[in-house]
Swiss-Prot record:
Domain of life: Bacteria
Any one biological process term the GO annotation gives: L-histidine catabolic process to glutamate and formate
Top-tier EC class: lyase
Modified sites of kind 2,3-didehydroalanine (Ser): 143
Organism for this UniProt entry: Staphylococcus aureus (strain bovine RF122 / ET3-1)
Molecular-function GO terms, alphabetical: histidine ammonia-lyase activity
Keyword vocabulary terms for this entry: Cytoplasm, Histidine metabolism, Lyase
Disulfide bonds: none
Pathway it works in: Amino-acid degradation; L-histidine degradation into L-glutamate; N-formimidoyl-L-glutamate from L-histidine: step 1/3
Chain's gene name: hutH
Catalytic activity: L-histidine = trans-urocanate + NH4(+)
Protein name, as recorded: Histidine ammonia-lyase
Length: 504
């Protein structure tokens, strides 16, 4: 598959397919024409010696400092070097790759004044999978993601560190190996590379893809738990959910009915008990609400993926061109969205932990042994797996605190309100990793519980999942190091995202 970029129509599904299929990027001709026209405006500004922020002036507090024309290019290189103050662990390879795609896509809108050489350099890095090593910490989320994007830009000019073919190398060495010249930044181009929200948005895209997948994965795991506890299927009837009108709640209920169809372990209302606890009965309401959040997040991300979030922006109308200093780099819309994503994913973990507690608690699990222990007393069984899940969901509650309500002034109070969107993105991804492990714990415990109940009673669809995951996690016949089982399941769940489509 080839991913065609035009600056206007990029979707998360495009990104997901690109990552799954190891695709190449191509640029449509109309987008290249827009790039040429916006660059021509920059050249006229330089020729006419106009005063325009970031082209003929300094940056931030130095916006009133006029730069000597002989130093315009040096100004851009200095910008990249001085702003590359990222710290901490690097973003994942996937996030860094998506970051480049998103920055390229915004340049193709034709409002940034980039040269074709810059556009082609980004395309080359993407297609050759030269992945800049970009530290995660250091962005305030306005003026965009300055520090992370500066590390991306360093790689393009041959000064940064990159991953290429599995090895960490100097960018300059990789370019030399591939007979490619480092990019020679022209006027405005440093600013065009780093003024934007691509770090938070790229991490947000990856987080959305994985969060949506966790939502689907959580349903079949919940279906195993439901059967292990002889759950009541009546609560998933379509008419119950249709009268509330929340479409994602209706969708989850339909998928739960599908997962449970043909099971002899489920029960009907008043057959064993009149109603189940909320963690079983309200799966459509709880999980559906998370999917509603995911839909909102997807919409916001896709707006930003196709937005011009540079500063200043170049506009060309009939018989008129103009350059405007604005604030489209401010990450507040994405910060809000990613804070919401944290809540949606955290609740998948919260309800999963409560379900798995019902599987191991002898006061709640019916006729199952305490902690599913093969020999209660001598062997502890799943006792501490629940502790681990409780620890992760409690950590999520701290991480879910909204980053977007924080702000701090910078650049001598010129930049006096910031979004902290990249912090929201980073914390959100940690919540996703934690939640994946909580679901892995529920999976390990539910596999054992269904085995004790009798797998022959499982629905056909959940029986296939049981067999698939039993090849990863063997039966619990004695106490062992269960962290290996948990991590194996979590890793398997994660790997499947970029190999196949999400489980529906």
């Amino acid at each position: 598959m080839t991913l065609y970029l035009d600056g206007e129509t990029l979707t998360i599904e495009d990104i997901k397919s690109f990552l799954q299929q190891q695709s190449k990027v191509e640029i449509i001709d109309d987008a290249l024409e827009r790039v040429k026209k916006s660059r021509a405006v920059v050249e006229r500004i330089i020729e006419n010696e106009e005063t325009v922020y970031g082209i003929t002036t300094g940056f931030g507090l130095f916006s009133d400092v006029r730069i000597d024309p002989t130093q315009y290019n040096e100004l851009q290189v200095n910008l990249i070097r001085s702003h590359a103050c990222g710290l901490g662990e690097p973003f994942s390879k996937e996030v860094a790759l998506v970051m480049m795609i998103l920055r390229l896509n915004t340049l193709l809108k034709g409002h940034s004044g980039a040269t074709l050489e810059l556009v082609r350099q980004l395309q080359f890095f993407i297609n050759e999978r030269i992945i800049p090593i970009i530290p995660q910490q250091g962005s305030l989320g306005a003026s965009g993601d300055l520090a992370p994007l500066s590390h991306l830009a360093l790689a393009l000019i041959g000064e940064g560190k990159v991953l290429h073919r599995g090895e960490e190398k100097d960018s300059d060495d990789v370019l030399r190996e591939l007979n490619r010249q480092p990019l020679n930044l022209q006027a405005k181009e440093g600013l065009a590379l780093i003024n934007g929200t691509q770090a938070m948005t790229a991490q947000g895209v990856i987080s959305y893809i994985e969060a949506e997948d966790l939502g689907y994965q959580s349903e079949w795991i919940a279906a195993l738990t439901h059967q292990s506890l002889n759950g009541i299927i009546d609560a998933y009837r379509h008419d119950v959910h249709a009268v509330r009108n929340f479409q994602e709640q209706i969708n989850v209920a339909a998928r739960m009915r599908d997962w449970l169809e043909g099971s002899t372990l489920t029960t009907r209302q008043a057959e064993i008990r009149v109603q189940d606890a909320y963690t079983l009965r309200c799966i459509p309401q709880i999980h559906g609400a998370s999917f509603q959040v995911f839909n909102y997040v997807k919409q916001q991300l896709e707006f930003e993926m196709n937005a011009a979030n540079d500063n200043p922006l170049i506009f060309e109308e009939v018989n008129e061109t103009f350059v405007i200093s604005g604030g489209n780099f401010h990450g507040q819309p994405i910060a809000f969205a990613l804070d919401h994503l944290k809540l949606g994913v955290s609740e998948l973990a919260n309800v999963s932990e409560r379900r798995l507690e019902r599987l191991v608690n002898p006061q709640l699990n019916g006729d199952l042994p305490a902690f599913l222990s093969p020999e209660p007393g001598l062997q502890s069984g799943a006792m501490i797996m629940q502790y681990a899940a409780a620890s992760l969901v409690s950590e999520n509650k701290t991480l879910a605190h909204p980053a977007s309500v924080d702000s701090i002034t910078s650049s001598a109070n010129q930049e006096d309100h910031v979004s902290m969107g990249t912090t929201a993105a980073r914390h959100g991804y940690q919540i996703i990793e934690n939640t994946r492990r909580v679901l892995a714990i529920e999976c390990v415990i539910a596999l054992q519980a269904t085995e004790l109940k009798g797998v022959e009673g499982l629905s056909p669809k959940t029986r296939r999942k049981y067999d698939e995951f039993r090849s990863i996690v063997p039966s619990i016949t004695h106490d062992r190091q269960f962290h290996r089982d948990i991590e194996a399941v979590a890793q398997y769940l994660k790997q499947s995202i970029y190999q196949t489509t999400a489980c529906h």
